[in-house]
Amino acid sequence: DITFAGVQRALPNAPDGYVPTSVSCPASRPTVRSAAKLSTNETSWLEVRRGKTLSALKDFFGHVKVGDYDVGAYLDKHSGNSSSLPNIGIAVSGGGWRALMNGAGAVKAFDSRTDNATATGHLGGLLQSATYISGLSGGSWLLGSIYINNFTTVDKLQTHEAGSVWQFGNSIIEGPDAGGIQLLDSAGYYKDLADAVDGKKKAGFDTTLTDIWGRALSYQMFNASNGGLSYTWSSIADTPEFQDGDYPMPFVVADGRNPGELVIGSNSTVYEFNPWEFGTFDPTIFGFVPLEYLGSKFEGGSLPSNESCIRGFDSAGFVIGTSSSLFNQFLLQINTTSLPSFIKDVFNGILFDLDKSQNDIASYDPNPFYKYNEHSSPYAAQKLLDVVDGGEDGQNVPLHPLIQPERHVDVIFAVDSSADTDYFWPNGTSLVATYERSLNSSGIANGTAFPAVPDQNTFINLGLSTRPSFFGCDSSNQTGPSPLVVYIPNAPYSYHSNISTFQLSTDDAERDNIILNGYEVATMANSTLDDNWTACVACAILSRSFERTGTTLPDICSQCFDRYCWNGTVNSTRPESYDPAFYLADNSMASVSLPTMLSTVVAAGLAMLILV
């Protein structure tokens, strides 16, 4: 039963389901490494992947033209030096199911496997041309669905069969339909959630609400019975297609909570999960641990000889649950709702033994960075590592892995589904947060640079939140090497895609409409709103590469940059409430408006039931 509804699964390689388990250590025992450079795994993989991206770029520029300029000849000329060629990253923001679906629309638009995506006016092949892709919170759910299901397509995830993935009409509260690959009813679903987490706790590991949240997410995101109990994030590195460099390297992003603090600030540590490692380039830790052996008792960067290797801690559901742990807070208000008392009793029984001080975090027990970099790390004395939702520091677009100087990313396509405004539209807050962090006097940015962006009011007043915009076009005006950022904010092209972050259920029609709207946002309605849009995307991709090779940009690129690059103009006047009009025909049944306090409380109360 390898496939269901056309969706393949990855590797269920955890030794004992959700329970982290002692295994024999490899001959070379795992250690924590310095973040001074990329891992040998990543550099070796890049040698393979960059060759694949060259081929993909040639295909992409076969249907995306840059005026009369022969991009294919340019790529051939520099094919012997991969560092001269464009290096592309894609970032998909958080924002719950809204972010998953809007981000899915962009990824669908970028995927050459999507029907008609390589036609004139479309952007199919950009995904295949990318080296890296990152997601946090709702964006991490999208990445998890795609990668754990063997780099499947968004089309195949848009299922219509009961019990299949992405059947969001059944909320996480209800659990999956008993049809299809799932064989359990709601009662069995709740029991499975509790049993999995209880097994981890009995094995001696700290557990929090994030464990149950991550297990619940797995039923919606992974095409496997019982929510893919044995699927790990590190298993991505073991899939032959990834090893062959056939698709981009995925990152899930989360934040650290500083010891003794509850508020996540701009100087918080930003972690990444990649297929091989967990860690950060930030100076607070500046280290990475082998992801496969999370849960092992590292001390001072090594594993003592009397300690076993642990595997299975990096459950794929736990990883994407960690990145979206903000939702934990909405699981705690059940007793303020009018839900039946027997439901509250069951829920509270599950929560009874969980640490009440850690309701909003994921507990990484033991801390893999215990006594590591003791002279500089505030986490070195902590036996447990508190990790939280990747957007809690305001950086809701996961740019951090993509702006690391060692990765040399030229251009980032930043898909922003944030709910910054009263009506749940983005206003650039995430980009502002990343820019301000790069200037933070604490040194937390650790040498990363980011192009200048304006304040949030300017984003709205200049229309930078209603259409794609470019930042960092003039690299000579940067504080350090930084990528050009193509900002793609969620906007209403044909559907009100601004559903609440905490809307827990979405029927297939709304799901598909939001995905279609996201496709239209990324392609500017298949270039019907700008005949030169795909050429302008191409110019953004080529810009840094042309600079390195001393190549003059074609005239059309100058026109594109005049049109899409922020020119430094600021208008900080406080705007009226931001409620953008449709670009295309309205396919919505009704406009999405500001929710009432009652509806927000009801949604929050329902979310609590995820842990029943």
Swiss-Prot record:
Signal sequence annotation: 1-9
Compartments reported by the entry: Secreted
CDD domains assigned: cPLA2_Fungal_PLB
Free-text description of this protein's post-translational modifications in UniProt: N-glycosylated.
Keywords annotated in UniProt: Disulfide bond, Glycoprotein, Hydrolase, Lipid degradation, Lipid metabolism, Secreted, Signal
GO terms (BP aspect): glycerophospholipid catabolic process
Superkingdom of origin organism: Eukaryota
Residue intervals of the PLA2c domain: 24-571
Role: Catalyzes the release of fatty acids from lysophospholipids.
Protein name: Lysophospholipase
Phylogenetic placement of the source organism: Eukaryota, Fungi, Dikarya, Ascomycota, Pezizomycotina
